[in-house]
Amino acid sequence: MGRLVGHTDKTPVSLGLLGAAAFMVIADVRVIDPLLHIIAKEFNVGVGSAAVIVSAYTIPYGLFQLVYGPLGDRIGKLKVITAALTAFAVGTALCAFVSNIALLTLLRFLTGVFAAGIIPVTLAYIGDNFPYTERQAAIGKYLSALVLGQILGGSLGGIFGEYISWRDIFLLFGIVSLAIAGLLWRGTRNFRDGNRSTERFSLATFKPYYQLLTQPTARTVIIAVFIEGFCLMGAFAYCGAFLRDRYGLPYVTIGFMLSSFGLGGLIYSRSVKWLVQRLGEIGLMGVGGWLMCICFLAIALLHNWLLFIPFCALMGLAFYMMHSTLQTQATELAPEARGTAVSLFAFNLFIGQGIGAAVFGRVVDNFGYIPCFIIAGIVLALLATWLFTKGKAEAEVRG
């Protein structure tokens, strides 16, 4: 992918290496999707109850955005990314040795705490090095690594779950993440980030969060990404168990099927410029949300597992159409403190996912998968309509 800017003394590590770190974080999240049914069976709990390991990861991931954003602005974003990835690697590897669901939940919680300091801080770092007109394309390239994590995370989870052991995939991810952290440390140990804030880290550090929320645009972005995380990511966590329970498919097949979501994201990353030119930011959010609704309804109501693959891929494309647009807007909410702005954005995304996974877990255990997917789809359509109409109205006011 090349370096962030043309001068190697300013950016000591490549965007590709930062993308590798992001790949591991996303793969670590998505690997759970095909394994949830296996883990529930091994520890003798329901699928909805086993999903506590999803919430245990995503809720602290969201909460600690509020710490890592300002911390990155003050001590240097690359240092935060390197330290967080190192701790993430250790926590992930230890998941391979748990003896009960409670210990796995605790380790997933700690891993989520450390994972929080990687992707959003990197996005803020990209924001510091690209002008706004080039930023969405740059973020689109960075998203390629995240999409690859989406694709291979689910696939590897299915392969290990079916043929090896779900424990070994965590050990593998931990070792690889530690190696990437070592490469980051080698490139950044003598680097001083010129974009650091000079203010001391204290309770006053969190004041910018309140200031951001006083902005109407910021409130719109934050509310939208919370709903997106709650509905899309919260409900999607149950797709793997749904495929197993409804169709009795092998775990390896389920893993590859879930990976089609990432394929849709890859299509987005390769066509982002064309999509932006054709639809604009407002159109991307509207069309993306409506397509996500259609996909959830199709998965719930069409009784053919082969149809899951194209609709899952379309859902991935639709998700990135909306999410990447919101993400790009988030990088411009506070140009003087992008780490803080992006962290507030990620906080709401993953808090939404954690709460959504818990709520939809209760829905699945008590009413089944179909109501879960229908509710998620309808709410996403309403979100898309709100963003589209609000965006159109604001564009008309601007003239």
Question: Could you say what each language-model-derived stretch is?
Answer:
Residues 103, 132, 141-188:
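Helix-loop-helix hairpin linking two adjacent transmembrane segments in secondary transporters
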Residues 107-148:
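Cytoplasmic helix-loop-helix junction between adjacent transmembrane helices
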Residues 63-99:
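Conserved MFS/SLC helix-loop-helix module at the cytosolic interface between two early adjacent transmembrane helices
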Residues 65-76, 267-280, 364-365:
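Helix-to-loop junctions at the C-terminal end of transmembrane segments
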Residues 44, 76, 97-103, 114, ...:
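Helix-breaking motifs and short loop linkers at transmembrane-helix boundaries and internal kinks
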Residues 2-7, 189-221:
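Juxtamembrane intracellular "pre-TM" segments in multi-pass secondary transporters
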Residues 87, 91, 102-110, 306-314:
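Paired small-residue
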Residues 282-326:
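C-terminal transmembrane helical hairpin of 12-TM major facilitator-type secondary transporters
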